[in-house]
């Protein structure tokens, strides 16, 4: 646990900006989703929220969608009245940037089930949360406190076959939060492709 906290702190320091910290209020944000609708974190006050950083061009993201792991995790969360916001912070100048309509089409093709998919092309939300990889996951409790930050699971590979034996950290965190417990592993090491910010 101590080493995980150290790793995550170093990741934040490397970002060159202040970023969200577990145990502190989750940074407020607003964005436009793939359907052109304005979405704010405040819209979901009083609800548990999951943030998922996603980029369809990343093989680590495709691992979790090709295996249907991410979709299953999204649907499990929805069944527990948890809000799930997928966030794409890829800058329009990057080669794997998708326009909102294309991003929406990709999510639909995958059978994804987020509450909304947000376009964060300027990277404001990503930088506020210190998101460095895709996928990268955050859980915010009903009080608006960031209670989990890190990876989707404990197996840092791009192989879909590895999902079955992996520990799903998001499911575990949600289980603790919804049971009124402190998250047992509030910080883990995220893995994946770098978030494609303008200066990355």
Predicted regions and their residues:
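Sec/Tat signal peptide C-region and signal peptidase I cleavage site
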Residues: 15-19
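Loop/turn elements at helix/coil->beta-strand transitions in domains of secreted/extracellular proteins
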Residues: 46-49, 79-84, 112-115, 142-145
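Thiol-/selenol-based redox modules, centered on thioredoxin-like
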Residues: 139-200
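Structural microenvironment flanking redox-active thiols in thiol-disulfide oxidoreductases
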Residues: 62-110, 121-128
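Short active-site neighborhood of thiol/selenol oxidoreductases, capturing the structured segment around
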Residues: 42-62, 174
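A short beta-strand-turn-helix
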Residues: 29-49
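Short, internal strand/loop/helix patches
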Residues: 104-141, 146-147
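Positively charged n-region of N-terminal signal peptides that target proteins for export
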Residues: 1-7
């Amino acid at each position: 646990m101590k080493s995980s906290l150290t790793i995550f702190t170093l990741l934040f320091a490397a970002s060159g900006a202040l970023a969200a910290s577990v145990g502190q209020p989750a940074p407020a944000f607003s964005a436009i989703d793939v359907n052109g609708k304005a979405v704010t974190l405040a819209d979901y006050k009083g609800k548990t929220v999951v943030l998922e950083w996603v980029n369809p061009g990343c093989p680590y993201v495709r691992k979790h969608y090709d295996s249907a792991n991410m979709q299953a995790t999204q649907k499990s969360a929805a069944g527990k009245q948890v809000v799930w916001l997928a966030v794409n912070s890829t800058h329009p100048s990057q080669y794997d940037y998708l326009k909102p309509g294309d991003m929406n089409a990709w999510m639909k093709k995958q059978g994804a089930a987020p509450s909304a998919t947000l376009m964060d092309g300027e990277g404001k939300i990503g930088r506020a949360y210190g998101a460095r990889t895709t996928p990268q996951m955050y859980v915010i409790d009903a009080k608006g406190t960031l209670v989990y930050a890190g990876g989707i699971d404990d197996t840092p590979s791009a192989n879909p076959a590895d999902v079955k034996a992996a520990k799903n950290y998001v499911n575990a965190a949600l289980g603790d939060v919804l049971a009124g417990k402190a998250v047992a592993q509030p910080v883990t090491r995220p893995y994946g492709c770098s978030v494609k910010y303008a200066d990355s």
